Every structure is written in C-alpha cells, then in structure tokens.
Amino acid sequence: MLANRNIVHVLDDLAMGGVTRALKNFEHPELAAMGEHKTIDIRKGRIRASGANDIAIVHFTANWKKLGWLLDLRLRGGFKRIILIEHSYTQGYEASEVLPKRRFRQMLRLAYRLVDQVVAVSQTQREWMIAHKLAAPDKIIAIPQSRICTDLLTMPPCNRDTGPLQIRAFGRFHKQKGFDLLIKAMARVPADLATLKIAGTGPDADQLEALAHGLDHVDICPPFDSPEAFLSEADLVAIPSRWEAFGLVGTEARAAGRPILAARVDGLCDQLDGGGFGHAPGSVSSIVSAIYRSANAANINERGRSSRDRAAVEYDQMISNWCALLSRS
C-alpha cells in the first residue's frame, strides 16, 4: 500500500447495485495497494482529505442540487485529485429521459469542470461526452466496466443445434431495461422459431406479466441465485435496454460463451463487436429482425466462443487501466 494516501470513495446511496459492484473492483490486490480505500456517504457531512496525496473518487450521480457537494470538494476538500466516475448519464439516457437537453448538458459541463478526471465506463459514453463538449477530450478517460467471471468462463459454451432459439434475459424489471419491448417482439415471433425466459424483479413486474399473458413461448421467472443454471440452456442473451452506461449483463453473457442480442446504444455498442446481434434501440420491429437473424445464423456457437475470448481479458484490462490512472502524479 502506498504510504500516507487515502482513496476516498464518495457516495450518496450505498444501496445502488451498479455502484456497489464497482466498489468491489477496488478490492483487487493491485488496486488495494494504491492506497487505503475508504467509502464515505457525503450526506453525513463534509468530506476532507487527511493528507496531501489523498484522492477522492466521486460515484454519486450529478444534478443541479449536488453541484454544491462537488464545489465543496473542489474548494475545501484538500484532495490532490478528484475523479468522477459517470455511472449513469449516457446518450441513450438523454434521448429517453431528458428535456430540455441544453440545460442538462450545461449541468454536466459544470460538474465535470469541478473534477480533475471524468471516467467514462464505455468508449461510446466517452464519445458522446466529447461530441457535446461536456469536458475536454484529455480530461475524459474510458475505463470499461467488468467483473470477475471465473465461474462463467468455465461453463460449457453455447452448443446450439436444432429447435427453437433459446433466448434468456435478466435484470431489473424497469423501463430502462426494455424488457417490455422484448416481449412485444416475441409476440411477433412464432414459438417454433424462438422461446424466451426473463428473470428478475422490479417495479414493472406486473406490466411484463400482462404483456407475456397468452404467450406460451415467453416465461417470466423470479431472480436466480446463480447465473450458470439460468444460462446453461441459453443460445444467446437479450439486452434490449433503452440506455445502458455499460451493461454487466453483457459481460456475464459473453463470459458464459453466449452471444448477445442487444440494442446498439451506449456501452452495449462496445460489447456487440463481431459476436453479437445488434438492433435499433427502442424498436420492436428491429428486435424482431434481430431474433430472426440470430435464429437463422449458422455460426452462433462460433460467435459465443469469440465473445468469451474477449470477455476473458476485460477484467484484467480494467484493473490495469485503473492502476495507471491512480498512479498519475
């Protein structure tokens, strides 16, 4: 561990799943050796550095009210550097959820001006930031998210033969994830072409159950304890999100040797590469077309293996990139 350096992770919601998963990455031995990591809830009071080399890493989602927190960290925090990870905002989020966009972008410009580096969690997110001049290009660093997937990397890979395409999807039942679009697409797909199982829970559960009513080739399942069993019979994993900063579901699917059928949006663009099947975001008809393409593809097994090979190295790349960033003087 580097002597006399604290790395303070600043949050305002300790229950956010994506953020808590990101924090686990800093337990990796190489990152743990970069300093003493501490997690602090900014709602409990002002946050101050205790040494000249301390670094603050901001995980909370910026808005107009929270600019005061960033201003206090900048002017009075005493940190050598402040790094903000953009877990939330993307081009897809802006297109789906934001009006007026001009005011939203101005808020982000002010927030990013108050920190030393902005970490985008995908290359596509970084490109969106640069395109709209939210911060200088040399201030924005892309460090794509990942997780340890040893359990999934050792699963038997996709072995599609004949019969209906076995599609799996999982995640929070929320508008963001686009499962309503996926079920509507399945209503246009015959049962002898594809079947779908969706696992999860969330505020849109009743809506999804209603959409799936009468569709014998669509099953809504409770959350699972282990993805291995849920994915064991999968030919591919669908990720029809309206927005997705990165999308760890894609990492897990690819590590399991399953290609993804995903919206061409935000961080999912980074994961489609040559192994996935892309569709237009928010488009039921485009999802239908992607299902037909994947069901008729003769190389799904090869696509799965290619996707796994890439996923296998992404975690180590992420750790290396974070070590390089934290090592900067």
Q: Predicted regions span which residues?
A:
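Membrane-proximal helix-turn-helix segments that form the acceptor-binding/catalytic region
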Residues: P100-V118
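A short, active-site helix/loop in glycosyltransferases that binds the activated sugar's phosphate group
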Residues: R113-K139
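Conserved donor-binding/catalytic core segment of Leloir-type glycosyltransferases
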Residues: N159-K177, I183-M186
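Nucleotide-activated donor-binding/catalytic signature segment of Leloir-type glycosyltransferases, i.e.
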Residues: E209-F224
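Aromatic "clamp/platform" in nucleotide-sugar-dependent glycosyltransferases that forms part
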Residues: R242
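Conserved acidic donor-binding segment of nucleotide-sugar-dependent glycosyltransferases
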Residues: G274-S285, Y292-A298
